[in-house]
């Protein structure tokens, strides 16, 4: 898993990237991984984190807030302001 090429991270779904990231975190937290391997899987974890953030930003950009009129009836959508 951790020895997969960095380029393939860009092809992973959010769910798959998150699953792999969680596995890496568990392995690092266990503290039983040799130093060189720890560094390699940490770097992979960083790439996976960036992929998840990218996919979340893309999903966020696609989410719209439904706007309503005075009677509460839906009349359209506008970009969701998540701040």
UniProtKB/Swiss-Prot annotation:
Q: Which InterPro entries does UniProt cross-reference here?
A: Exonuc_VII_S (IPR003761), Exonuc_VII_ssu_sf (IPR037004)
Task: Give any Pfam family that matches.
Answer: Exonuc_VII_S
The UniProt record lists the EC number as 3.1.11.6
Source taxon at top rank:
Bacteria
Subcellular localization, as worded in the UniProt entry? Cytoplasm
* Keywords on record: Cytoplasm, Exonuclease, Hydrolase, Nuclease
Top class in the EC scheme: hydrolase
The entry's function note states: Bidirectionally degrades single-stranded DNA into large acid-insoluble oligonucleotides, which are then degraded further into small acid-soluble oligonucleotides.
Annotated family:
Belongs to the XseB family.
According to the record's subunit comment, the protein's assembly and interactions are:
Heterooligomer composed of large and small subunits.
Record-given protein name? Exodeoxyribonuclease 7 small subunit
Tell me which species this is from: Rhodopseudomonas palustris (strain HaA2)
Name the gene behind this protein.
xseB
């Amino acid at each position: 898993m951790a020895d997969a090429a960095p380029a393939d991270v860009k092809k992973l779904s959010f769910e798959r990237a998150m699953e792999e990231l969680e596995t890496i975190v568990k392995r690092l937290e266990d503290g039983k991984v040799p130093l060189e391997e720890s560094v390699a899987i940490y770097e992979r974890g960083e790439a996976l984190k960036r992929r998840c953030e990218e996919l979340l930003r893309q999903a966020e950009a696609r989410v719209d807030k439904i706007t309503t009129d005075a009677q509460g009836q839906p009349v359209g959508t506008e970009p969701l302001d998540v701040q």
